[in-house]
């Protein structure tokens, strides 16, 4: 069978289902695919196909996730669903499945539960831009007032974590009934997708963002100058443009006088390209692995930040023992390790392998970071944790 051509004319977005265990995330995922399949926009997926999520390795961490795709009239979606709570935590922190938006599933019969709260907090911390709510299992609730109460609770909870609780679309339905083909509830799934289409903002493509390239290697070409190589993480770079060299030392400016890829000279390079950038007036020792080349003013070096961190369990090859405040591991940002000191939040004595925690980190050298920058925590070259920057302190 010939592979279908990927349709680029539609906007693409990555979304996922989040919420408390057994509130119906996987059933909803199956229902969306199945209902949209009737419109010819998707391939029907059974609950079991989605629930038996394959294991994936991301930064050495084992995560179970199911990826399915479907389309609405407006967009093409890649949808991620995780079977277990721990998988969600790992997924969101490592960014294994980047989410441009989320569907928060809350059982109308139970209302918000501990993981509902935790998933909202995680979404806020790792920078999921928008959430839409699906109140599930409404067929099990006879009392209209109870439904309104649950909706109010969910809205308050979202507001508590800085999502616009009053404006978030809330759609009430039954994923199971929709999956069974009940027309009234199928309509609710279409209503939900309409809300996702309109309320979740179109993600900015990597190539439209300001230029940044982590430096992987540096060498000098006699008579031409210094070349920094790496993969362009975002944006574009044209020959003749100015860039800043950021991190580890004081920031300096230079001009890119040549861009090379696979030994061919290019006029410009964009996100995803592996390139060599020829830098004007830069000595070989002025640029090193671990720094980034970036559009002037787009990103700044910092030494202190808050982060949401997942600590690998012993089974994942992580630590066998807990750690405490003043723990000093290596923080691996993009292409290099930098030593840092961990400060745990008040009331947290220690962190056990398998936990997730919000911590403050102080690095011994400045690194180009911003909200949403991902990193690994390492000890002697092995990964013991994974994190994402949630707030810059200095």
From Swiss-Prot:
UniProt-listed CDD domains: EF_Tu, EFTU_II, EFTU_III
Region of interest: G2: 60-64
Residues the record lists as binding Mg(2+): 26
Binding site for GTP: 19-26, 81-85, 136-139
Catalytic reaction equation(s): GTP + H2O = GDP + phosphate + H(+)
Pfam families: GTP_EFTU, GTP_EFTU_D2, GTP_EFTU_D3
Family annotation (PROSITE patterns): G_TR_1, G_TR_2
Protein name according to UniProt: Elongation factor Tu
Record organism: Staphylococcus aureus (strain NCTC 8325 / PS 47)
